[in-house]
Amino acid sequence: MDFDNEDCFDTGWTLHIDADSIIFAQCCIFNDDSDVDRHRITQGVRRRVLELTLDAGCDAAICFLTTSTNFRDDMVDDYKANRDADKKPKPINLAWAKRWTARNLTCIFKNKLEADDLLGIWSGGNSIIWSIDKDLRQIPGKHLDDSTRKVVMITEEGILKDLGKKVYFDGLAGFYYQCLTGDSTDYIVGCGKRIPKVYKSGAKKGQAYISRSGVGPQAAVQIILQAYMARGDSKANMLQAVRDEYQRLHGADWQEHLETQANLLFMVREMHEGRFIKRWTHDDREEYFDLVEGVISNDYTPPATEDGRDT
């Protein structure tokens, strides 16, 4: 597929694409170490990017990529640790395909940051976000919904819906919901604790395993929705409800636990001088994480002239 003159919408909007999933999907299909498969991967990536750009009604697209390093590994020792337990071999052409995409399409990537974080940093303005990752829905603004191929608006407050077997969430409501439940995909415990246990019966009898004890999905939905619908500021009410649960579980150490879990889940929105990212804090205090040193920088002040997108 190629653009022609009739394809040019002249809208001034740019589609910001989480390209990791596009590249991975193509590499899973064409997984032979051959020039033929690599050519097919490039065709598939180009086609998908153009299709999404057309669906969003945008004039241009920027692909965002994840590198092999992540600042969250500097925060905790077990980020995504569950993925290492039964790690499958990566598609043989994956690294090559990422390099090709970076060299041949308009791309943004940064060591220590995921594509999700970069999408957060570059959000706003005349941009629309596309991603199949549920976590990106915490970023307010226009998103291209993958299932309907329609552009939808996510508000800052967000929404939370109990759909029975699944929970739909976005915006701050979704972020606070995840602060309570954690994210088992990335081994984020949320408002909970990991407890060593042993199977007492069955085929695994005697084997050790780790169980999470804490706020579960149904309880989290009730807590957040009750706070959301209470009188007053819904954003402040939801935040206080999350604070209360962490205080109940962790006592005097609640703030450290809350901010650690929140920053594992939070999509970065601000970066300065190519290394200092603004952290989420429960009381809105200014605090930055140094990507180079891998530590919180307590005395950093961003230059007044920067816009928070310096990569």
Task: Tell where the protein language model's regions lie, with residue ranges.
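Domain-level signal for Mg2+-assisted phosphodiester chemistry and nucleotide/NA-binding surfaces
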Residues: 1-96
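Extended two-metal-dependent nuclease catalytic cores across DNA- and RNA-processing enzymes
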Residues: 2, 7, 58, 82-310
